[in-house]
């Protein structure tokens, strides 16, 4: 952007660019409609909405630094160095443009095509929605050499926009206090915010995002802080995701172009693993269900690699038919496109429906990949050899899988012999417990409610699928038992033989129930890795849970209490034992098998009393990195992670 364009942009961005669509009243009544939910996810979404405004300024070329601060009182401050929200008079609304942006839903420059070419925000509800769901919010605008301010309570302004000082900077500063009467969770997680800020920095090269947590003091007295900044954008992003994997080819194949009016940025890397990891974004939103841009990418990749291999007579020795997903084994890619008016659809509104984008991505990837392969014959041969290996493994996998899928999952035929099924056939109410060990499985079978609770005992640690070739999973009895019991099928949706289909899922609650020790946690992680790599839809749709059996049974006379944490146990000792451990009898449960069926039901299985942890997929790219780091071949990153997090671990020593 030239200096002249920048000056014109600054002078043209005014009240007339602010369009208004609808009122705010509905937001407090039905918050989940606007921000997804009212738990931790929705709470963090408030921050993303405010940051999205600053990112829009950055994409338009007016901002290069965004500061996000978690304050000591758990309020959030977001400040950017953009142009500042317009404060002049809005003719239609008869008030300051700033007040319109802050108090009217869907009011903002992002709905006026002249102000922003593209704009982020999945729900795109804007900062007014954040205002409505905050007990208090303060906005300061640095513009025209002056500081303007307005404060609000639950979305209502406390006074008109006023000047409160002079300044040499430009930008906007927002501080808000989420409403505890609306949100079930009001404590911000630094890690969740850091993950999203890191992602935004990779997706928008050249923008500096500073995240500070004033609640946490470091050893030197300073506050916890990270600066996220990327020079190479997606190139660095794909290297970060793949940092715990062995690279097949050291190059990142990078594409940054515009086709058919759509900006397309793609980074591709091949590794020696057996998983396909493609992360796609539209206007900075992670489209976890894919869509037109992902279809265009896959089509181009398959066509271009296949043509190169055939032209160079590399497939003749393969003796197997090569399919689309063979080309994607061991592939890590990030696709980021910008669309002026994205149409989102699918289960979680994260699937791109704009079909015109498919051709643009197809053309961009096809041209760039073709050029790369011609210029790098050695690397191209390594990629094609890997494809042939994948095809041979796929044929072996199909044979193994067909033996699993021969019987219908709904008929009860073909169910694992160890499965103690429930009598109900309604997936909405049915629960499947994946239980560690036969002895605990026996207690669970006796203690359960047979109407809606099914039990599948697992023998020891299941296969670590992160290190195994695709078809090896289907040769594992324990993995097969889980797939059969759930009613999951593969390759029924067309071109991708590895795509899981959960339309006939037999249970809408899948609960991992293991011992409360290190081995139990390891088994939890192995099972979660299987779900994430083979049927992530179960996690995405919120069906996977982890049971939390109690650690202790504390007794004093006739008073008995189960304790899930050391803090609860200490509270019992303080209350009933006068602070003396010796005055209280404590039974430590090392394993589920130590509980009788009634105790297991009462503490861990009864929906009235139990505590379940729902497994969330907050950020697919970060989860991809974490699973490959924890469960993959490379020991170094795993050791670093353990050393960094050892203080939080529950270790039986």
Q: Language-model segments: what does each one mean?
A:
Residues 2-17, 24, 48, 56-58, ...:
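GHKL-family ATPase ATP-binding module
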Residues 29-48:
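Conserved short strand/loop->alpha-helix "switch" segment adjacent to the catalytic nucleotide/phosphoryl-transfer site
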Residues 84-89:
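A short glycine-centered beta->alpha linker in the GHKL/HATPase_c
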Residues 90-91, 98:
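Short adenine-binding "F-helix/F-box" segment of the Bergerat
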Residues 91, 345-358, 562-568, 572-573:
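Helical (often loop-to-helix) elements that flank the catalytic cores of nucleotide-handling enzymes
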Residues 392-411, 426-431, 442, 446-448, ...:
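C-terminal interaction appendages of subunits in large macromolecular complexes
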